[in-house]
Every structure is written in structure tokens, then in C-alpha cells.
Amino acid sequence: GLVARKRGTMVFLASVAGQIGSQTDPPYSASKAANINFAQCLAKDLAPHGVRVNTVCPGMVKTPLNEAVWRAWHDRQPAGTARSYEDWAGEKIRALLPLGRWQTPADIANMVVFLSSERAAQMTGQTVNVDGGFVMHW
């Protein structure tokens, strides 16, 4: 395994919901927070063995599941405010995210590849948000 080889990397996937909480799905947020913490514990345990452990936290990723959730939200808007889903969702995303666009699965994959590479050789125990600026720690 990784410890026997004295090198390797693990990348966990969590969510920004694990950092800021979710009013609509507290169990999801709690499980993602636990994921982040578990990865940090592993990072401390495995660093002396040359194994790096990091976490990627996606934000608003444009996936079929997220689109279904957002469409359901859109469909509950008051009558008379009818706008296309695309216009409505685009406005919401631009208001929520400083970079003003959905993340894509490729955005998340690119960070996982980076963290798995030698370019990230000095990174362990880190939680990296790929979220268009949604969560900013000052």
C-alpha cells in the first residue's frame, strides 16, 4: 500500500456545504464536514509515511442532479414571475458566485489531478474549494 511504498496521495471529495452548512439538508452538510475532518486526521497520521491527503470541496457544479434540484426550486416561484429556467438560474448563479458561473465536473477533476501530481508535493491536510468564490475565508 501507500505506507509500505512511503509515498502516495489520497484526495477526498466533500462539499462547501461541509464548511458553511445547509439550511435545506443538515445531514448532508454534517457528513461532508466529517469527511473534511477525517481527511485532515489521515493527513496527520500518514504524513510521516510520505502519504499526502487532501480534500476538494466543489461548490455549484452543473450536474443533472443539481439541475433537477434547481429546476424544482424554479418551478416553485410565484406566478407572474415566470422566466425561463436558464435566465432565472443564470441570474441566481451570478448573484451567488463572484466568478459568476457554474462549476463543471472538469473543474473539479482538474483540481483532483493537480493534488495528485508532484506539483502539489508540499500539500497535505488541505481543503481546497473549487466553488467560483462562493466560500471565502478571510
Language-model features, listed with the residues they occupy:
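Conserved SDR Rossmann-fold cofactor-binding beta-strand/turn motif
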Residues: 52-62, 116, 129-131
